[in-house]
Amino acid sequence: MNTEKKTYKRALTIAGSDPSGGAGIQADLKTFSACGCFGTSAIVAVVDENTVGVTGVHPVPVEFVVGQIRSVLDDIGADAVKIGGGMGNIARSNRRSDIYYDPS
């Protein structure tokens, strides 16, 4: 019997929420899982969207986004951070090898 504990890389996505599952944190979490990573998220916007298009965006207050990020990092941590399309400028201004940004 194998009793070796499996460890996973931890990845945090900071992005909007897409209810259709094709973009945003939903797509990121599926990708992390497919790559063998434990995925966590901080939601920056709730989006009214489907496969046809976006009909509305409701931004999450900055202080709440910061709170989500702190909660994840204080408890679970992150080996890498992926920043969604609308937040790419933040990543570009703070170049690190463990931060990835969606250029869209």
Located regions from the model:
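Glycine-rich phosphate/adenosyl-contacting loop at the front of the ribokinase-like
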Residues: 1-55
